[in-house]
Amino acid sequence: MRKIMLMAVAILLCSTAFAQATYADIGFNDIATVFSELNDNERVVFLIRHGERGRDYSRAGLLTENGKAQARMVGEKIRNGEQAFYAHSDYDRTKQTCENIAIGRADEFIHEEWGILNGDWYRKDLDVIRQRGWDNWETLSQWAYEGGHEEGFYNLEERSKEWLDSLKSHLPDMKRINVLVSHDYMVTAMAIYASDKQVDLHYWVNRKWINYLAGVAIIIDKDGNMRFKTVRGLDSGVLAR
């Protein structure tokens, strides 16, 4: 009986470890690790989702107290005494996220509001999307991996490159360390693009979606070349529903 019980405990521990590894989602790097590995001649732009919000999805919707604490913790992870630049959408919760990350970094809150962070970047025709019932996580994730839905959505690769070109135009006014806060639709699509579709955000298949404070690190060398790493500010880059 004792032997059977020990075997059962071992199986349970293995199963738990596997579940945690699956939930953490191989492919999302801890934001602190990515930050610590930056070379002195590299710049970084963290494009991430806002912190945990309440049930108000409107522009006036705010972070929960937990969401504020999450953002401050992420700021502490990427704190180095160097002033960062912040940009957010016109939604209050993205500004709050930037502000609390700045608190965690002990930064002055230098920030701008950017329209390209509002979350609709990849949606070509919102009327079509709504008429066809595509305004949901299932459709967005399937489109990002498999394409199609051309009447409502742009081409993922082409539209992502357009966004990155737009980012380049802002770089002269930015810092070496930069934090951009957007929304789940925008960040999910960019994470799928930046990882060459390697991150597991197949919501229409397995109910996995981008977590709060997860996204993409855009690392820029002295010659302007870009490379990408998907990052997580919390324990996981994925929300499993």
What positions do the PLM features span?
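Active-site-proximal alpha-helix that buttresses catalytic centers in soluble enzyme cores
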Residues: 20-115, 143-154, 200-230
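Active-site-adjacent alpha-helix immediately C-terminal to a catalytic or transition-state-stabilizing loop
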Residues: 161-225
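Active-site metal-binding loops of divalent metal-dependent hydrolases
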Residues: 50-51, 184, 234
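C-terminal segment of classical bacterial N-terminal signal peptides
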Residues: 14-19
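Flexible, surface-exposed loop/gating regions in the mature catalytic domains
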Residues: 55, 82-85, 99, 109, ...
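Sec-dependent N-terminal signal peptides
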Residues: 4-13
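Low-complexity, Gly/Ser/Thr/Pro-rich intrinsically disordered linker/tail segments
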Residues: 225-241
